[in-house]
Swiss-Prot record:
GO terms for cellular component: photoreceptor connecting cilium; secretory granule. Belongs to the small GTPase superfamily. Rab family. A motif (Switch 2) lies at residues 85-102. This is Ras-related protein Rab-37. Keywords: Acetylation, Cell projection, Cytoplasmic vesicle, GTP-binding, Hydrolase, Lipoprotein, Magnesium, Metal-binding, Methylation, Nucleotide-binding, Prenylation, Protein transport, Transport. Transmembrane segments: none annotated. Switch 1, switch 2 and the interswitch regions are characteristic of Rab GTPases and mediate the interactions with Rab downstream effectors. The switch regions undergo conformational changes upon nucleotide binding which drive interaction with specific sets of effector proteins, with most effectors only binding to GTP-bound Rab. A motif (Switch 1) lies at residues 52-67. The keyword GTP-binding applies.
Amino acid sequence: MTGTPGAATAGDGEAPERSPPFSPNYDLTGKVMLLGDSGVGKTCFLIQFKDGAFLSGTFIATVGIDSRNKVVTVDGARVKLQIWDTAGQERFRSVTHAYYRDAQALLLLYDITNQSSFDNIRAWLTEIHEYAQRDVVIMLLGNKADVSSERVIRSEDGETLAREYGVPFMETSAKTGMNVELAFLAIAKELKYRAGRQPDEPSFQIRDYVESQKKRSSCCSFV
C-alpha cells in the first residue's frame, strides 16, 4: 500500500501521533445513597441539589434505583458525587441492599411531619449496619422543615437520635433548598479528607463541621 506523500508511516520509523490522555473534570469520586421511607422527599432532595429546582405536583415514588451525578469543589478538590436515589417501599428493599456495599456515604431522611418515617429510622440504621461498609459516612436529615405548621417531630428529637448513633444531624427542606447543599458538601469534604490526608492538614470531623455551619447559617440567616 502506498502512503500519502509526505506522511509518516510505520515504515518510516516514526511513532504515530497520539491523542493526549483523557483527563476527567474531577479528582475523586464518591458514591452516596439517599435512604428513608417512601414519601420523605428523597427525589425532591436530589433534584434540588442537582438542578436547584423543586419537583412539585403529583408524587411518584421511585421504583428501584435512580442515579444522578454532580461535581462539587471542596478545599480545591473536585469531587464527583454519584448519588443514588432509592425506593423506600418494602418490596424494593432487596434491590437497595445490593447497593449498600458500594456506597461510601448515606443520607438518611425522615419527614418532620410524619411520625412513622421517624420511628422507622432505627430499622434503617439496623439495615445500614448489616449491609453497608463498616466505615460508611452516615448523616441523619429531618426533611420538609419548610412545613413547620405540620411538624410532629421536634428538632431536639432528631438531635437526640443522631447523638445516640454518633452521626451528624440537621433539618433540611427540598422545597426551599435549606441545608441541601450543605449536606452534600459536608459529605464531599469528608470523602476528600479520607481519600488522602496531607501531613500538615488538620483533622476533619464531619459532625463538628455540620454544627459550625448550622450555627453560622443561624447567625447570618443564610440557609
